């Protein structure tokens, strides 16, 4: 998986690799992933082919889908069709796959709002169905480069990284509040971790 990320690359999550979603689904869990999934962009790599009932999110490092907006990106539509990134995907385990449009610079401002709303709805549906659930929510905050909507900018006076962390904290609060609202907080395991999220680019990585 060291080279996962290029649009259309054959590398990605293998069918031989077990996922926690597959293990839990066999025990009656509803399984959903919302947010970043950087494990390959072909259909066979999608989370919904690896144990997840539902997936909503992007398939690359977080600024890859902005590349077609760069001024030096090839203008030939055939190039973009063959080599360009897919958009934000919404897929389900029954084989339905919807490309909801590109994760461009403007949409980057609100993508965490989108996937948080999707995660909250998933939780509602799982509880309504009286099923245990596994939810994997991967926000884009906090990652460089990031883009914030107007109302999130300047709230700390400490720059975009701190402002983004405040927005991130709000989204986490929404998820935790949903557990309380549904009356399942005392019967739910919550794990929080970062994958990287450097506050600045540092050589050599």
What are the roles of these predicted feature ranges?
Residues 1-205:
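Formylglycine-dependent sulfatase
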């Amino acid at each position: 998986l060291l080279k996962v990320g290029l649009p259309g690359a054959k590398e990605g999550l293998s069918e031989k690799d077990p996922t926690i979603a597959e293990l839990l689904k066999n025990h009656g869990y509803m399984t959903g992933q919302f947010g970043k999934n950087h494990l390959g962009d072909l259909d066979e790599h999608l989370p919904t082919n690896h144990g997840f009932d539902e997936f909503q999110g992007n398939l690359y490092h977080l600024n890859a889908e902005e590349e077609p907006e760069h001024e030096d990106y090839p203008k030939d539509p055939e190039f973009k069709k063959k080599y360009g990134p897919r958009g934000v995907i919404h897929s389900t385990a029954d084989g339905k796959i919807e490309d909801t449009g590109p994760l461009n610079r403007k949409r980057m401002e609100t993508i965490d709002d989108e996937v948080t709303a999707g995660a909250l709805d998933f939780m509602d549906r799982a509880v309504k169905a009286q099923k245990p659930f596994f939810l994997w929510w991967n926000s884009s905050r906090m990652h460089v480069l990031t883009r914030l909507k107007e109302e999130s900018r300047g709230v700390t006076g400490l720059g975009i990284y701190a402002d983004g962390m405040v927005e991130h904290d709000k989204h986490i609060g929404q998820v935790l509040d949903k557990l309380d609202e549904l009356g399942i907080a005392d019967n739910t395991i919550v794990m929080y971790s970062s994958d990287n999220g450097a506050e600045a680019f540092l050589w050599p990585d």
